[in-house]
């Protein structure tokens, strides 16, 4: 491909045994995890996605990995939308505390993107409506809404009926009303 694009390689859900008529079965699956930008060069993902800086350096974080509606196939991504990990600033993966996150520094600031605002105190409302944005099963960006908090009695996490899969690990989950 051209010098300003990377070729996307990966199979499809159909290649993994999903029926060919299933929704998204023909779309390219490449991502292993999801993440979200919290500062120009800082990304949050799941702690089990990044085991350390040497492991993290093997990952690429891609923005605009999505289909435009006219095709199910993503053959290339712009080089400018592909970032590398240079530092794992903080990581936690603990069954005791139920924490599973990593804060990583990217190789350069992400341009043309506004980092998300993260709730830093309190907890989500017991009846909050939720939205998740990520890469379920390695698919291009998907947005799933229509979900809500089901159980909210733990300090570290809540239970929801969000439609998420492997690959959504590290996805941003938003309160549909406040955006936080």
Task: Name each model-derived stretch.
Residues 36-37, 164-180:
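Catalytic nucleophile loop of clan PA
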Residues 159-162:
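RNase H-like polynucleotidyl transferase catalytic core
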Residues 1-30, 37-40, 44-157, 175:
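Serine endopeptidase catalytic core focused on the charge-relay Asp
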């Amino acid at each position: 491909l051209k010098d300003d694009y990377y070729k996307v390689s990966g199979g499809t859900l159909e290649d993994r045994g999903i029926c060919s008529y299933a929704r998204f079965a023909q779309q390219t699956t490449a991502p292993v995890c999801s993440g979200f930008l919290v500062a120009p060069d800082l990304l949050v993902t799941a702690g089990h996605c990044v085991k350390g800086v040497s492991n993290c350096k093997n990952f690429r974080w891609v923005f605009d990995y999505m289909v435009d509606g006219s095709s199910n196939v993503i053959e290339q991504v712009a080089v400018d939308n592909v970032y590398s990990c240079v530092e794992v600033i903080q990581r936690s993966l603990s069954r005791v505390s139920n924490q599973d996150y990593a804060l990583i520094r990217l190789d350069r600031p992400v341009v043309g993107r506004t980092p998300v605002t993260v709730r830093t105190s309190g907890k989500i409302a017991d009846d909050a409506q939720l939205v998740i944005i990520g890469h379920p099963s390695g698919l291009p960006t998907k947005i799933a809404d229509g979900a809500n908090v089901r159980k909210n009695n733990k300090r570290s996490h809540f239970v929801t009926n969000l439609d998420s899969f492997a690959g959504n690990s590290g996805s941003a989950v938003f309160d549909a009303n406040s955006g936080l």
